[in-house]
Amino acid sequence: MGSELKSTSPLAVKYDLSQKIMQHLDRHLIFPLLEFLSLRQTHDPKELLQAKYDLLKDTNMTDYVANLWTNLHGGHTDEDMANAFAEKRRSVLQELSELEEEVQGILGVLENPDLIAALRQDKGQNLQHLQEHYNITPERIAVLYKFAQFQYNCGNYGGASDLLYHFRAFSKDPELNASATWGKFASEILTVDWDGAMEELGKLREMVDSKSFKDSAVQLRNRTWLLHWSLFPLFNHANGCDTLCDLFFYTPYLNTIQTSCPWLLRYLTVAVVTNQNNANQKPRNPRQSYQRRMRDLVRIISQENYEYSDPVTSFISALYTEVDFEKAQHCLRECEEVLKTDFFLVSLCDHFLEGARKLLAEAYCRIHSVISVDVLANKLEMDSAQLIQLVENRNNPSVAAASNVAADQSTEDESIESTSTNVVADDLITEAETATEAEEPEPEVQFGFKAKLDGESIIIEHPTYSAFQQIIDRTKSLSFESQNLEQSLAKSISELKHATV
């Protein structure tokens, strides 16, 4: 996948993270990324076709793999390969028949209303009940896992998810339960059930964080996988960006990012910048405030700049570390090209650009009291008339409210039209590209302070911010941080004791 063919943007190919991310995904999760790259035409189509074949040739999707092989060889068929695919297909169908027969009796019992009413919270009691009344042993329960794995390799992700649900309800095998949780998470992603995927993400995170690993490298690998797999639901669920910030800023996972996958800082940056709507909300946890997240993000990007950087992270560095507005503008233009060819971020491209322009405006206005309309409009890549109207609307609440209502109505109309024209909404690629099919909105920037027009200039009214208030703001989270540190130390001591025993 190294060669380039029809790339409309060499920049997009240079900063493409697909290959880095694929190293930490299950083969079935890799496939949507390959499909996305095929649609974007940023790589050699034949190499992508070969990658799909190599990816799926060991699965049970024999018919699809046979089609890939035929397309890979220019539509020509080979008798030996055709016989090999036919033999594998017969083998798969035979195994399917055997497993269905073996599992049918178990599923009939597990779906029995009388059994469901008799179940308890304790798995041991449930297994004993199954063995005494239905002659279902732990070995027979394990067949559910085997059949789920078979269905998953056939591409029947919904069926695999249901089987894994029943398996986890009765299995006491910790290793198989852990594997089943990973499989359930992947199945929910591939069936585009984002609510279910978020629920499984929580279970998986709890399992990875609470489990005592003898080898710290194994725990690091598990957290690395979790971070990469989580990109699917977190950038598709309604509350995904906020949850992503909580997960990625959590110290163990932040350490994982800095140690093994610094490229994930791109996704953390986009999540923080696009989550500015919650900036004025007061969270129960001070560490979750937008201002705190932005400060932490700037610090982390500065620390990891030697290890990884791209236009997205460079924009934050240029704006807050270097205070170079020209460089920030240049990075912002590059961000658009990079984000529109990123599988996970294509739908957030416009939201990120809008949020980034707001940050650029606020940073520029923070160090000025009087700004030329033309200069600020140039910084934000807006028309002067647009900027003047924006400032006037912000100073007139009634006009602003009417403008917002009209914008909301327009967005709703576009959404309805988009829904009617996109019939297939359950495909990962379709969801990733929904935003790019809609007409790009006009850039909008909301100032975090008062601004008024004075001829061809904008007068910035900076709020008074006393030294006492600064001290209060900087120390009000110390109590929470101390408590969090105490809990972390207690957990570390407990883990050391268990490891010693």
From Swiss-Prot:
Primary role: Component of the eukaryotic translation initiation factor 3 (eIF-3) complex, which is involved in protein synthesis of a specialized repertoire of mRNAs and, together with other initiation factors, stimulates binding of mRNA and methionyl-tRNAi to the 40S ribosome. The eIF-3 complex specifically targets and initiates translation of a subset of mRNAs involved in cell proliferation (Potential). Required for maintaining the basal level of atf1 and for transcriptional activation of core environmental stress response genes (CESR genes) in response to histidine starvation.
Family (UniProt): Belongs to the eIF-3 subunit E family.
Compartmental location: Cytoplasm
GO biological process: eukaryotic translation initiation factor 3 complex assembly; formation of cytoplasmic translation initiation complex; translational initiation
UniProt KW keywords: Cytoplasm, Initiation factor, Phosphoprotein, Protein biosynthesis, Stress response
Single GO cellular component term: eukaryotic 48S preinitiation complex
Protein name as annotated: Eukaryotic translation initiation factor 3 subunit E
Keyword Cytoplasm: yes
The PCI domain, residue ranges: 245-423
Modification sites for Phosphoserine: S477, S479
CDD domains: eIF3E
Keyword Transport: no
Organism lineage string: Eukaryota, Fungi, Dikarya, Ascomycota, Taphrinomycotina
Record-linked PROSITE patterns: PCI (PS50250)
Subunit (UniProt): Component of the eukaryotic translation initiation factor 3 (eIF-3) complex. The eIF-3 complex appears to include tif32/eif3a, SPAC25G10.08/eif3b, tif33/eif3c, SPBC4C3.07/eif3f, tif35/eif3g and sum1/eif3i. This set of common subunits may also associate exclusively with either moe1/eif3d and int6/eif3e, or with SPAC821.05/eif3h and SPAC1751.03/eif3m. The eIF-3 complex may also include SPAC3A12.13c/eif3j. Also interacts with the proteasome via rpn501/rpn502.
GO molecular function, one term: translation initiation factor activity
Gene null: resulting phenotype: Slow growth, reduced polysome content and reduced translational initiation in minimal medium. Mislocalization of proteasome subunits to the cytoplasm and impaired proteasome assembly, leading to the accumulation of polyubiquitinated proteins including cut2 and cdc13. Impaired mitosis and spore formation. Enhanced sensitivity to 3-aminotriazole (3AT), caffeine and thiabendazole.
Biological source species: Schizosaccharomyces pombe (strain 972 / ATCC 24843) (Fission yeast)
Organism domain of life: Eukaryota
